Amino acid sequence: MYRKDLDHYLKQRLPKAVFLYGEFDFFIHYYIQTISALFKCDNPDIETSLFYASDYEKSQIATLLEQDSLFGGSSLVVLKLDFALHKKFKENDINLFLKALERPSHNRLIIGLYNAKSDTTKYKYTSDAIVKFFQKSPLKDEAICARFFIPKTWESLKFLQERANFLHLDISGHLLNALFEINNEDLGVSFNDLDKLAVLNAPITLEDIQELSSNAGDMDLQKLILGLFLKKSALDIYDYLLKEGKKDADILRGLERYFYQLFLFFAHIKTTGLMDAKEVLGYAPPKEIAENYAKNALRLKEAGYKRVFEIFRLWHIQSMQGQKELGFLYLTSIQKIINP
C-alpha cells in the first residue's frame, strides 16, 4: 500500500506487523513514530524495544515476539534498519518474526528499512523479499507493507498544513510555503519548525519564520561549538559572542542546526555502519570536516541527543517569553551531556 492507503488503514484498525520502506526516509521515520504512539495508546503497558542495524540480534528479537503476554508484558519491537551492507541480517529472519506473531499475544512489530542510496539494487532485493514474506503470512491483513515515494511539492505542503492544523497553528498557506522554501524544501526540517512556531501561541508572521530559520553558522559560533566539545570555557566564548553583538536567538539557532546535523550523522552511522557525509548533508565537505562531524556525532548516545534537544526547546520557549542571555543557564548543562 501507499501512504494514503496506510492513513486510511490506521483510522480503521491497528496491524500486528508493519513494514515501512521506499525512497523517502522522513516518512519512514514519521510513521514509525506515529504507529508506535498508536500502539502505546491502545496498550499503555506495552514495552518498546528498539534495534538498529548495528545491534541487530535475531534471537533476541524472536524471543521478544514469542513471549506470551498472558504471563508477562507485551512487546513492541521496532527495527530501524538499512541492510545494504549488513551481513547479520537474512531476509528469512522476517519469516521467523511473523510466525512468532501468529501466536495469541499483544506483541507488535514495526520494521523501517531506510533507503540505501549507495546500493539501490540490494535495497530493492531486500525490500521485495520482506514484502513477499508479509504477503504470504497467515496474519493476512494484520501484516501490512507501506512504500513511500519522494513527495511532490504540493504533497509536502499539504502534509505540513495537516500538521499545522493538528497543532492549531495559525499560519497562512503563503507563509507555510515560505517556511518550506527557506528550509530548501526539506520536509523534515519544516515539520520540526512547525512545532517550534507553535509555542508562540499567536498568528505566525514572516518575521517569525525568518527569525526561526536564519543560519547562524559563522566562524565565531564554530568557536563556541569547539569549546563545548573540548571542555573549554563555553561560557567565556558565549560572553564574547554577546559582547560582539551576536544575538542570543542567533546563537541558539546555530547550535540547533549543528546538533541536528550531528544527529543525522549519528542516525546514519548507527543505521548503515558507514560515514557518508554526502548522504547526510547533501554535499561532500572536505574530509577533515566530515571526519570531525562523525567523531562529534558519536560522542553522544540517543538519550544524550534527546536531552540536548529538550534544552534547546526550553531555551527557545524562554527566549520567546523575553528572557535574555539564556546561554549562561544552559551551555554548561549541554557541555556536561557531551562530556559526562
UniProtKB/Swiss-Prot annotation:
Q: Which UniProt keywords apply?
A: DNA replication, DNA-directed DNA polymerase, Nucleotidyltransferase, Transferase
A single GO BP annotation from the record? Answer: DNA-templated DNA replication
Molecular function terms, GO-annotated = DNA binding; DNA-directed DNA polymerase activity
Q: Does the keyword Nucleotidyltransferase apply?
A: yes
Q: Do the record's keywords include Plastid?
A: no
Alphabetical GO CC annotations of the entry are:
DNA polymerase III complex
Checking InterPro entries in the record gives:
DNA_polIII_delta, P-loop_NTPase
Q: What does this protein do?
A: Could be the functional equivalent of DNA polymerase III delta subunit (HolA).
**Subunit record text:** Seems to interact with H.pylori HolB.
Q: What is this protein called?
A: Protein HP_1247
Q: Which organism is it from?
A: Helicobacter pylori (strain ATCC 700392 / 26695) (Campylobacter pylori)
Q: What is the lineage of its organism?
A: Bacteria, Pseudomonadati, Campylobacterota, Epsilonproteobacteria, Campylobacterales
